[in-house]
């Protein structure tokens, strides 16, 4: 973990709310700490959120959000090999419906819809959650990724836009919300706004690979290939080491090499990274 993130990971935790004040059904304090650790891993792509969540629910099998989050995180991997584990996590959460709050019940519905291929309905369910709990970082992250997978540029921008007023720098994970907003603006061709917000996110959290990714898109779309290459290389130690999203950002660097007709460098990245 990044030290400043982990130091604040247990900020304002209680048995009933997470670090952003979002309600959670009663659980062990250690379970909520595991949830926060996994959420940081999920947002930052540093570490394995599913590994953390598996250990958390093993220690507390009745932790509803642990099962819901584990299913949701695996769903975002979009790999068939995880389907049995996803189904098990969803069924575990469903079996605890008697102790689930309304938010958790809706998140279970979203996970079930997503598993069964109803991606649009899953996004509607996440939106229902966000209408009541705009600081639900897991819900906004899942919905944003699903907008990404579905190519829904308008919701990449507007879904974050509907909740951003409830976030500010003192709220844990704010930089990642800005990074999502920046990418949404870029996908809607609002490049200046995207660049401004991505840079703001990186001022708060320099290791945010998604914000670097948003900037790479801006520079690719504006033909700023040399600047884009310099961006990726100068920030390599922020976004590349031990980051699960690094392979995609390496691909963006390869694109900048290709734009310069530096094909050997692009091929070398393909072979080595």
Cite the ranges covered by each PLM segment:
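Alpha-helical repeat scaffolds
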Residues: 52-54, 83-96, 120-130, 154-167, ...
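Internal metal/ion-chelating core segments
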Residues: 161-260
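TPR-adjacent "capping" and linker segments in tetratricopeptide-repeat scaffold/adaptor proteins
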Residues: 14-33, 93-104, 169, 173
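Residue-level recognition of tetratricopeptide repeat
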Residues: 30, 62-66, 102, 136-137, ...
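Inter-helical turn/loop elements of alpha-helical hairpins
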Residues: 10-11, 32, 37-54, 58-62, ...
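TPR/TPR-like alpha-solenoid signature
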Residues: 28, 35, 68, 107, ...
């Amino acid at each position: 973990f990044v030290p400043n993130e982990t130091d604040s990971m247990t900020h304002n935790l209680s048995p009933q709310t997470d670090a952003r004040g979002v309600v959670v059904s009663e659980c062990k304090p250690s379970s909520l700490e595991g949830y926060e650790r996994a959420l940081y891993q999920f947002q930052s792509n540093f570490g394995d959120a599913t590994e953390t969540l598996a250990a958390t629910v093993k220690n507390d099998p009745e932790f509803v959000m642990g099962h819901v989050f584990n299913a949701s995180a695996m769903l975002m991997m979009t790999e068939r090999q995880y389907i049995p584990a996803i189904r098990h996590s969803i069924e575990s959460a469903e079996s605890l419906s008697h102790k689930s709050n309304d938010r958790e019940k809706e998140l279970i519905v979203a996970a079930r819809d997503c598993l069964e291929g109803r991606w649009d309905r899953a996004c509607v369910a996440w939106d229902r959650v966000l209408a009541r709990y705009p600081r639900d970082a897991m819900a906004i992250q899942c919905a944003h990724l699903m907008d990404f997978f579905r190519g829904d540029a308008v919701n990449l921008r507007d879904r974050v836009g509907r909740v951003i007023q409830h976030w500010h720098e003192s709220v844990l994970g704010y930089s990642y919300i800005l990074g999502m907003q920046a990418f949404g603006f870029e996908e809607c061709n609002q490049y200046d706004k995207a660049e401004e917000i991505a840079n703001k996110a990186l001022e708060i959290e320099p290791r945010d690979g998604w914000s670097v990714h948003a900037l790479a898109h801006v520079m690719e779309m504006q033909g700023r290939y040399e600047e884009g290459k310099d961006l990726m290389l100068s920030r390599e130690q922020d976004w590349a080491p031990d980051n699960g999203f690094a392979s995609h950002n390496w691909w963006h660097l390869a694109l900048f090499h290709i734009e310069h007709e530096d094909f050997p460098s692009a091929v070398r990245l393909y072979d080595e990274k």
